[in-house]
Amino acid sequence: MNVGNISTAMITPFDSKGNVDFQKLSTLIDYLLKNGTDSLVVAGTTGESPTLSTEEKIALFEFTVKEVNGRVPVIAGTGSNNTKDSIKLTKKAEEAGVDCVMLVTPYYNKPSQEGMYRHFKAIAEETSLPVMLYNVPGRTVASLAPETAIRLAEIPNISAIKEASGDLDAITKIIAETPEDFYVYSGDDGLTLPILAVGGRGVVSVASHIVGSDMQQMIKNYTNGQTATAALIHQKLLPIMKELFKAPNPAPVKTALQLKGLDVGSVRLPLIPLNEDERLSLSSVISEL
């Protein structure tokens, strides 16, 4: 499954009443595709999936597939902590025409490694789509062990993982012990270059909303052997990568887009907009790019 080097974990635009704004989404998609994005993740965590209804998610899948019109792969966030519900949503995503699904590790109910294995296996067996796993223990509490990820990689259509554990030893083990066509993506913008250095494919990114073209240049320099230049770009981008997570995601990146002249609306409760100090800090970092 080739979804490129930079897959943007796309925000969901809202109007002034908090409804999904599809006109703003159309504008956002075109903007992202012109600024370094190789593929789009729809209705993931950055897309505020916890506060989107099932109907809204399906509408987002359908609209994005139609709007993208084959220009880049579309990845649907269909994971949850309910296996049956994930299967249902995955089937709806497949009907909508997406190219891949992303499945987050089950949150809150804290399954065992065997439970997570069976969960992902059950969903993968119900779809013909490629599956990208998503390990983000900082949000889910339960962490997918590298041994479990390696075992899951044996399932034919489980073909990638977004790794946001921050554990480079575990990530290296996954890369070393899975097939060459099983791709490991960084789930943390700031670890993109280190994960490339141990054999990773790229990043599922939030920062690419703002600095996608710069990130593409960093990856290009690295893959062309210009590692010192790649390191300099990494150092330049690290402040904005960190700033975008100083408040709960995606409030900072939505504000950053607004500061760049792209109105995408606010966030849904229980998330709240940035306060004035946070906004000023973000604006200062952006002005130095």
Swiss-Prot record:
Pyruvate binds at residues 46, 204. Keywords: Amino-acid biosynthesis, Cytoplasm, Diaminopimelate biosynthesis, Lyase, Lysine biosynthesis, Schiff base. The keyword Transcription does not apply. CDD domains: DHDPS. It catalyses: L-aspartate 4-semialdehyde + pyruvate = (2S,4S)-4-hydroxy-2,3,4,5-tetrahydrodipicolinate + H2O + H(+). Pfam families: DHDPS. It is found in: Cytoplasm. It is an enzyme of class 4 (lyase). It comes from the Bacteria. GO terms for molecular function: 4-hydroxy-tetrahydrodipicolinate synthase activity. InterPro entries: Aldolase_TIM (IPR013785), DapA (IPR005263), DapA-like (IPR002220), Schiff_base-form_aldolases_AS (IPR020625), Schiff_base-form_aldolases_CS (IPR020624). The active site is at residues 134, 162. Pathway: Amino-acid biosynthesis; L-lysine biosynthesis via DAP pathway; (S)-tetrahydrodipicolinate from L-aspartate: step 3/4. GO terms for biological process: diaminopimelate biosynthetic process; lysine biosynthetic process via diaminopimelate. GO terms for cellular component: cytosol. Its EC number is 4.3.3.7. The record marks 45, 108 as: Part of a proton relay during catalysis. Homotetramer; dimer of dimers. Belongs to the DapA family. Catalyzes the condensation of (S)-aspartate-beta-semialdehyde [(S)-ASA] and pyruvate to 4-hydroxy-tetrahydrodipicolinate (HTPA). PANTHER family: 4-HYDROXY-2-OXOGLUTARATE ALDOLASE, MITOCHONDRIAL (PTHR12128:SF66), DIHYDRODIPICOLINATE SYNTHASE (PTHR12128). This is 4-hydroxy-tetrahydrodipicolinate synthase. It comes from Bacillus velezensis (strain DSM 23117 / BGSC 10A6 / LMG 26770 / FZB42) (Bacillus amyloliquefaciens subsp. plantarum). The gene is dapA.
